UniProtKB/Swiss-Prot annotation:
The record marks 442 as: Transition state stabilizer. It catalyses: Hydrolysis of (1->6)-alpha-D-glucosidic linkages to branches with degrees of polymerization of three or four glucose residues in limit dextrin. This is Glycogen debranching enzyme. It is an enzyme of class 3 (hydrolase). Pathway: Glycan degradation; glycogen degradation. The keyword Iron-sulfur does not apply. One of its GO terms (molecular function) is glycogen debranching enzyme activity.
Length: 658
């Protein structure tokens, strides 16, 4: 091998220029950095990075080509109480590696040490970075740029979405390639969604505790390397190229791809967790530590990344730009996003927020926050700055309690239906900032929400202690999926009411994959470690009628101007009227204490009627010629009504025609 040259400090990671590879690694406190190259037989060659510019260590190797496996051994003091955990016995993964080979196992060689550094060499078993070439042919691919007002998000897991799909070749099921298969493209288009939001696809690890139980991390919220695609979702040898092709195909169909990204913590867990990467590279820079060198655990995952440091801001921004530039991603959903704004207290003007807002490339992307973590003042719904949209759990809980428990007033329901203006109508934010959902990957599926009163998480190995107990679910009198026909009919009505609320409310709707055809996880509301038929969508036995109902609602949403314009509804502008059961405007008493019967008139010619009571009732429609529309009546046989005979827990939509 040729002698290593000084190289350049940028870009971060391993960059192939057609002649060789530049290696660049940040470490403010390191005393020496060894680049470790591995051949096909696992033989290691060590080379000191010869130069460092400020806190960036770097070197260039002319002889190296794409496919090269590599890692780092970083030398420095071992002073855990000061947060310094350098240990050259541990091979460290490049945080900016574009490709990864190998998986983390439950092996003692990954332990760093306590009073003294552990001397077991992790090199033979540690995951390695892989050098990649940026040579994918995007041809004339363009980002769909779906307006926020027209956006309908579909949250899905790469494996779970297609693992059991009979229309996809067996070798392709559960992979990136399956996302772009014609069967799935056709399905997305018939359903009507505009944006596919994927649970984490960046490389992640399974926690040692799960491995000991014979389980694995299924969701992927345990990140190992945020630039690299998870190889277990690839059916071929090149995960990134396979993913790029899927994105390209989805774009050709006009469908956006949004990634769930995890920058709040890492797979290194707490002080007793494995040393895999950042802990051994520059622990005090990458993580929030207390005065004794222990990790601040504001994420519930053992550690919390420090995203105030200029290097952390720069590398996070670079990672986001990488996904947009190299993989043509359309947007990001940030897991536990309060952590991104910690300084360590939460600030709307935190450095990373300002950097995202100022970046011209990211300004064209959809930016979504999960607006909480478990740290001090971690709940920040409505308090994120533009351009963030936010998961609105107020919408979720109000919709569930209004329909399933008879809680909240008509006014409370209307406030959430109108994009939660009390939370989001500030600092120039638009209604689309309220990302509305009834269910998500975390919690009950929609079918389980109306079938189980209690969680059933025994399979997770924690004696049913994990998962939320505050689900606001209702089993309609029978626990579990099997129930008498009358109970099944009541559940169907509740599902229809909740879907109608979600898909015809102002704001940005997000639908959980599988809810549109009745997927169940049999009462498990925390299936993060269930990579099996419990979480994989059952396509053979899906409820086709429910799919048709959901698709019709999405297509109906497109026809209602008040839901497409992404501007706040104002009194008297014709966007909305709130009416009682007699077709008259709600008075104050009905607004605050009235029975749960409501009519919502949108854009003057559309009328949504709701009966969220347990009794059949008649609602007098406002003056006009009102025709029930699909999915509440057939296209060829619209029903003309002046009074709606509303079933208990019933809903209907009408259009006024001259």
């Amino acid at each position: 091998m040729m002698p290593i040259r000084d190289g350049q400090p940028a870009p971060r990671g391993a960059s192939y220029d057609g002649k060789g590879v530049n290696f660049s690694l940040f470490s403010q406190r390191a005393e020496r950095v060894e680049l470790c190259l591995y051949d096909d037989d696992g033989v290691e060659t060590r080379l000191d990075l010869p130069a460092h510019s400020g806190d960036i260590w770097h070197g260039y190797l002319p002889a190296v080509r794409p496919g090269q496996r590599y890692g780092y051994r970083v030398h420095g003091p071992w002073q855990p109480q000061q947060g310094l955990r350098f240990n050259p016995a541990k091979l460290l993964l490049d945080p900016c590696a574009r490709g990864i080979e190998g998986e983390v196992t439950d092996n003692p060689c990954f332990q760093s040490g306590e009073e003294q550094p552990d001397t077991l060499d992790s090199g033979p078993l540690a995951p390695k970075g892989v050098v990649l070439a940026d040579d994918f042919d995007w041809e004339d691919d363009t980002w769909p740029r779906v307006p926020w007002g027209s956006t309908v998000i579909y949250e899905a897991h790469v494996r779970g979405l297609t693992q059991l799909h009979p229309g996809i070749p067996a070798e392709m099921r559960g992979t990136y390639a399956a996302l772009g298969h014609p069967v799935m493209i056709d399905y997305f288009q018939r359903l009507g969604i505009t944006s596919l939001q994927l649970l984490p696809v960046a490389c992640f690890a399974s926690e040692p505790r799960l491995l000991r139980l014979g389980l694995s991390n299924y969701w992927g919220y345990n990140p190992l390397a945020c630039y690299a695609l998870e190889s277990r979702y690839a059916c071929g040898q090149n995960p990134r190229e396979e993913f790029q092709q899927a994105v390209k195909t989805l774009h050709q169909a006009g469908i956006e791809v949004i990634l769930d990204v995890v920058f709040n913590h890492s797979a290194e867990l707490d002080e007793n967790g494995p040393t895999l990467s950042m802990r051994g590279i520059d622990n005090p820079t990458y993580y929030w530590l207390d005065g004794q060198g222990n990790y601040d655990n504001w994420t519930g995952c053992g550690n919390t990344q420090n995203l105030v440091h200029p290097e952390a801001v720069a590398s996070t921004l670079d990672c986001l730009r990488y996904w947009v530039e190299e993989c043509h991603i359309d947007g990001f959903r940030f897991d536990l996003a309060t952590t991104l704004g910690r300084t360590p207290e939460y600030r709307r003007d935190a450095p990373l927020f300002q950097a995202i807002a100022a970046d011209p490339l990211l300004a064209q992307c959809k930016i979504i926050a999960e607006p909480w973590d478990i740290g001090p003042r971690g709940y920040q719904v409505g308090n994120f700055p533009p351009p963030f949209a936010e998961w609105n759990d107020h919408f979720r809980d109000t919709a569930r309690r209004y329909w399933l428990h008879g809680d909240f007033s008509n006014g409370d329901f209307a406030r959430r239906f109108a994009a939660s203006s009390d939370l989001f109508q500030k600092q120039g934010r638009l209604p689309s900032a309220s990302l509305n959902y009834i269910t998500a990957h975390d919690g009950f599926t929609l079918r389980d929400l109306v079938s189980f009163e209690h969680k059933h998480n025994e399979a997770n190995g924690e004696d049913n202690r994990d998962g939320s107990n505050n689900n606001f679910s209702y089993n309609h009198g029978v626990e579990g999926l099997k129930a008498p026909l009358l109970v099944t009919e009541h559940r169907r009505r509740s599902i229809h009411a909740l879907l109608t609320t979600l898909l015809l409310a102002q704001g940005t709707p997000m639908l959980l994959a599988g809810d549109e055809h009745g997927h169940s996880q049999h009462g498990n509301n925390n299936a993060y470690c269930q990579d099996n038929v419990l979480t994989w969508l059952d396509w053979k036995h899906g409820d086709r009628g429910l799919f048709s109902f959901t698709a019709a609602l999405i297509h109906l949403r497109r026809r209602i101007p008040a839901l497409q314009q992404d501007r706040w509804w104002q009194e008297g502008d014709g966007s909305v009227e709130w009416l009682n059961g007699q077709g008259r405007q709600l008075n104050r008493l009905e607004w605050e204490q009235g029975v749960h019967r409501l009519q919502i008139r949108l854009s003057k010619q559309w009328l949504i009627t709701l009966n969220a009571t347990e009794e059949v009732c008649d609602l007098v429609l406002p003056p006009g010629k009102w025709h029930a529309v699909p999915p509440f009546a057939g296209e060829d046989n619209p029903i003309l009504l002046t009074v709606w005979h509303g079933a208990a827990q019933g809903v209907c939509v009408f259009q006024e025609k001259s």
